[in-house]
Regions:
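Extended, low-polarity segments enriched in aliphatic/aromatic residues
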Residues: 1-181
Length: 181
């Protein structure tokens, strides 16, 4: 998976293209009961939103989710590329939303979620997208990658989770309907 980080958006579009060739019309279900704001996927802050999304248009479900989170779907490269490749709909004007929310409400909604880096992803960004990119093949396509995997494991499981993460989980368990059941 480390090979894909520098081209993650293009990789996701390629995977969608393959999925549509193999099995078009697959129903996607996105669980928005508890969403995550902040650097992810392991260090997000849980936010209860109590929504479920379903669609046979994989791009549309991502576009609606992105908009609700507070992002312009067409600014998310994989959504834009998939829309331009006609693999699905990324423009909200081309998507009909029905259920507890309609398209107009989705367009008005902005949960103001944020993205960002934690210590582990900030180091990765230096190699995948930043000034150390010329060295990325040496570090991520050789056995040296195991040192990064171990460092991420130590950071997330032995530093971040005990000092920050467990408190977030306890709060979610104590204060939400999802934690009490």
């Amino acid at each position: 998976r480390h090979y894909c980080h520098p081209n993650i958006h293009e990789t996701l579009v390629d995977l969608l293209r393959i999925q549509l060739e193999i099995q078009a019309g697959t129903l996607a279900v996105a669980d928005g009961t508890t969403c995550g704001s902040g650097p992810g996927p392991r260090t997000m802050t849980p936010v209860v939103k109590n929504l479920l999304f379903a669609s046979t248009d994989q791009v549309a479900i991502d576009a609606v989710s992105a908009k609700l989170l507070g992002f312009d779907p067409m600014d998310v490269k994989c959504i834009r590329l998939a829309d331009e490749s006609e693999l699905g709909h990324g423009h909200l004007d081309d998507i009909e939303v029905v259920g507890d929310m309609d398209t107009a409400e989705v367009k008005r909604t902005d949960w103001e979620f944020v993205v960002g880096d934690n210590a582990a992803s900030a180091v990765g960004d230096l190699f995948w997208f930043g000034p150390l990119k010329p060295l990325s093949k040496i570090f991520f396509q050789t056995p040296i990658v195991n040192a990064f995997i171990m460092a991420s494991f130590i950071y997330h499981d032995y530093i971040w989770y005990p000092t920050e993460g467990w408190g977030r989980v306890e709060k979610w368990l104590d204060e939400t309907q999802w934690g009490r059941h």
